[in-house]
Amino acid sequence: MQTTAQKRELAEKQEKGLSVKSILIVAVLIAAGAVLKIFSNTIFSFTPLKPNMVIAMYCLAIMLLRPRVVEAAVIGLISGIICMFLPGATPYANIVSELVGAVVICLLAKLPYRLEVKGLSFKVAIDTFLATLCSGYTFFLMLKVLILTGMELSGMAIDVFTAVIFGTAAINSVIAFLLYPVLKKVLVRE
């Protein structure tokens, strides 16, 4: 049985933040997302809008590691800064949109709902989809504020943005759905 002092020591250890191992996991996943984003940018080079796979990777990192909201916000800020240096970036828009997306996925991860079909959990896919939508629409809002201020956007332009945002959300949710169980098993083994 644990004494009160041992419980207090355990609580203090838990409040210190992400471990070095967790930070390395976040770094590797965000780097993989950056590579996927560069790769997808070459595939979609003919379009003005491109999907962002960094979102899927920070969603995976946050769902796997369950950081506090502040730590998730830092993960989002770092992801946004990295996105700014990738080809085809819109200055500053990614910083805000990835911050929002990371905080949203962190809050969604804390919700106690479960959605399973024949033993397969769809929570990660749904949470990633919703976080990507929040990030995408925040990016769109930032784009409107930073670049398109005063410009009238046609219905078709908004439809294109919406299609890219929902398409990216679908791709990211599939990536998260497929990789989450594998990564979770690897992390549990260690």
Regions found by a protein language model. Name each.
Residues L29-G33, E71-C83:
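Small-polar-interrupted transmembrane alpha-helices in polytopic inner-membrane proteins
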Residues Q2-Q14, S22-V28, V35, I75, ...:
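Short helix-perturbing small/polar motifs within transmembrane alpha-helices
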Residues S40-S45, L65-P67, L86-P91, Y113, ...:
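Short helix-capping/hinge motifs at transmembrane helix termini and TM-loop junctions
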Residues K37-K50, I78-A109:
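Interfacial aromatic-anchored transmembrane helix boundaries in multi-pass membrane proteins
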Residues Q2-L65:
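Hydrophobic transmembrane alpha-helices
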